[in-house]
Every structure is written in C-alpha cells, then in structure tokens.
Swiss-Prot record:
The chain crosses the membrane at residues 1-21, 27-47, 56-76. Belongs to the UPF0410 family. It comes from Bacillus subtilis (strain 168). It is found in: Cell membrane. One of its GO terms (cellular component) is plasma membrane. Keywords: Cell membrane, Membrane, Transmembrane, Transmembrane helix. Pfam families: Transgly_assoc. InterPro entries: Transgly_assoc (IPR007341). Coiled coil: none annotated. This is UPF0410 protein YwzA.
C-alpha cells in the first residue's frame, strides 16, 4: 500500500513540476510519475530534505527537482523547425 501511495505522490509531484516550466512532459501520467521520482531524487541530492514530507518525499525539493526534469525533457523532445 505504501508503494502505491508513493507512486501517487510521485505523479502529483511530476504534475506540479510541469506547472512551473513551459513545455509538456511526454508520456502522460507515466511520464509525470517518472519525472516525480527522478525529480525527488535530484531535488534530494541538490537541496536536501527540508520542508514538509509526504510518503517519504520532501515535497519542496522534489517539486523543484521535477520542474528541472520536466524542463530538460521538454528541451530534449521538442520538435525543431
């Protein structure tokens, strides 16, 4: 059950991260979940574990990390021309 909650929180974090940057996260809900998980990992590495926690995620660093991930992915996947 805690794994399912972690996935739901990761989806929400990925979605919140995508709200802060211009560009779309490809892959829909799965892409948002992956951005949330990777973003939480990056946010933890860069910013630590301060702020409120939910399901093992430090929310503020995770959302900032997810915004970074969404921004980078949107740069890499945008169509040129």
């Amino acid at each position: 059950m805690s794994f399912l909650i972690s996935l739901i929180v990761a989806i929400i974090i990925g979605w919140l991260g995508s709200l802060f940057v211009k560009g779309d996260m490809p892959g829909g809900i799965i892409g948002s979940m992956i951005a949330g998980l990777i973003g939480a990992w990056i946010g933890h590495g860069l910013l630590g574990t301060w702020g409120p926690h939910l399901a093992g995620f430090a929310i503020i660093p995770a959302v900032i990390g997810a915004a970074i991930v969404v921004f980078l992915v949107s740069l890499l996947t945008r169509k040129r021309g």
